[in-house]
């Protein structure tokens, strides 16, 4: 069966968007690599944004000068960029496999809307657009960091973080109800390459994106307070404590969102929790390296306690997720859409009608026709039948309860 014109249009739009995504991926791979080498057009090494040798938590920010606050050092920034690049490489392979799988699966289209359902299962054009926006914004972020514009870099990274949150939600939920997602998954032919891509490769890519989202939450928290600390007359220690507390609060909203909404679409979404553990290690490294600086400012204990709470909350949230997975497996409540047809057997006997007592005036007028109506009533017989009807049936009225020969 041929696909509908609407499905063909969706597929062509998806292919064109996929080409743009591939081009943007190549550019996002080139920009970080070239930015690490001197004499290639970048004025500064973007990883070395903050000089922790001049870190003083008791000072206030200095005008016309970059005041060092808590941020990623070159090793941590390199790890972050590398992990994001690995996730993008796996996503690149996934979408390439998805395109090949869709080309093969087009020969097995059995409905007018199957092709658009398969495109949405692999990754709709909206998901690809958000992925393109992520790749573009991370390039701009690296270029802005090379020029040491901390205010503009914080704004650009806010756009990148927002695109990452929307993209992660779109990968998990497809911005559709649960029953629509189930129907799209059920339309995929079993034991095909498309089946393997959607049900085995896509969860891996989604968890990698969720892990990168946890790291991006850390960078976003540090970028916000780096910009605030260099914009207003604040103490550096307050900015450090504010960055740690923001990174403590933001994941809590994601934990709640996961249990309330995202878990209905994807049970095994542990990528964010793994990313939070890695981000906690990255955050605690400056506290260990520059312990004397934090101790002299009397912030070592406070910052250490707040940083330690982050992996503890992550562990609690992950245990809740694991318990809910086992509970759902025991209950076995995995809902699927109803079949297209149902078999309905009509009742063999009609429903009893309420008796009506005629008035004396009406009895005289209808006396001439009573004998004929009684004979026609005796000729009526209930009929038992089986009908194959659609899953959505109209309500029957009283006049349709009896079937006349």
Curated annotation (Swiss-Prot):
Residues 386-397 have a biased composition (Polar residues). The chain crosses the membrane at residues 18-38, 77-97, 122-142, 150-170, 193-215, 246-266, 268-288, 300-320. Keywords: Disulfide bond, Glycoprotein, Host endosome, Host Golgi apparatus, Host membrane, Host nucleus, Membrane, Transmembrane, Transmembrane helix, Viral envelope protein, Virion. Residues 39-76, 143-149, 216-245, 289-299 are virion surface. Residues 1-17, 98-121, 171-192, 267, 321-405 are intravirion. Its main location: virion. Residues 346-405 are annotated as: Disordered. It is a multi-pass membrane protein. It is found in: Virion membrane; Host Golgi apparatus, Host trans-Golgi network; Host endosome membrane; Host nucleus inner membrane. Belongs to the herpesviridae glycoprotein M family. Envelope glycoprotein important for virion assembly and egress. Plays a role in the correct incorporation of gH-gL into virion membrane. Directs the glycoprotein N (gN) to the host trans-Golgi network. This is Envelope glycoprotein M. It comes from Epstein-Barr virus (strain GD1). The lineage of its organism: Viruses, Duplodnaviria, Heunggongvirae, Peploviricota, Herviviricetes.
């Amino acid at each position: 069966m041929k696909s509908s014109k609407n499905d063909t249009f969706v597929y062509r739009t998806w292919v064109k968007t996929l080409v743009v995504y591939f081009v943007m991926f190549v550019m996002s791979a080139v920009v970080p690599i070239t930015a690490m080498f001197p004499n290639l057009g970048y004025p500064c090494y973007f990883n070395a944004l903050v000089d922790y040798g001049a870190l003083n938590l008791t000072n206030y920010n200095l005008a016309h000068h970059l005041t060092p606050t808590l941020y990623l050092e070159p090793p941590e920034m390199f790890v972050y960029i590398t992990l994001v690049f690995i996730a993008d490489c796996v996503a690149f392979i996934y979408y390439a496999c998805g395109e090949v799988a869709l080309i093969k699966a087009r020969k097995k289209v059995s409905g007018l809307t199957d092709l658009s359902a398969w495109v949405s299962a692999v990754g709709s054009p909206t998901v690809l657009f958000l992925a393109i926006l992520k790749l573009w914004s991370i390039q701009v972020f690296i270029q802005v960091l090379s020029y040491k514009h901390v205010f503009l870099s914080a704004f650009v990274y806010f756009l990148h973080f927002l695109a990452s949150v929307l993209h992660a939600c779109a990968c998990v939920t497809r911005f559709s109800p649960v029953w629509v997602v189930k129907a799209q998954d059920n339309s995929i032919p079993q034991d095909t390459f498309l089946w393997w891509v959607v049900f085995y490769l896509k969860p891996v890519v989604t968890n990698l994106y969720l892990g990168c989202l946890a790291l991006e939450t850390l960078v976003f928290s540090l970028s916000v307070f780096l910009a605030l600390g260099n914009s207003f007359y604040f103490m550096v220690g307050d900015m450090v404590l504010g960055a740690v507390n923001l990174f403590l609060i933001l994941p809590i909203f994601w934990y709640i969102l996961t249990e309330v909404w995202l878990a209905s679409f994807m049970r095994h979404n542990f990528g964010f929790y793994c990313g939070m553990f890695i981000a906690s290690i990255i955050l605690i490294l400056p506290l260990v390296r520059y312990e004397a600086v934090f101790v002299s400012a009397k912030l070592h204990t406070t910052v250490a306690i707040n940083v330690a709470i982050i992996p503890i909350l992550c562990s609690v949230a992950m245990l809740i997720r694991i318990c809910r997975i086992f509970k759902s497996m025991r209950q076995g409540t995995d809902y699927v859409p109803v079949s297209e047809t149902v078999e309905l057997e009509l009742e063999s006997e009609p429903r009893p009608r309420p008796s009506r007592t005629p008035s004396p005036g009406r009895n005289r007028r209808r006396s001439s026709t009573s004998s004929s109506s009684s004979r026609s009533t005796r000729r009526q017989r209930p009929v038992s039948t089986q009908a194959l009807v659609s899953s959505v049936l109209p309500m029957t009225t009283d006049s349709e309860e009896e079937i006349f020969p």
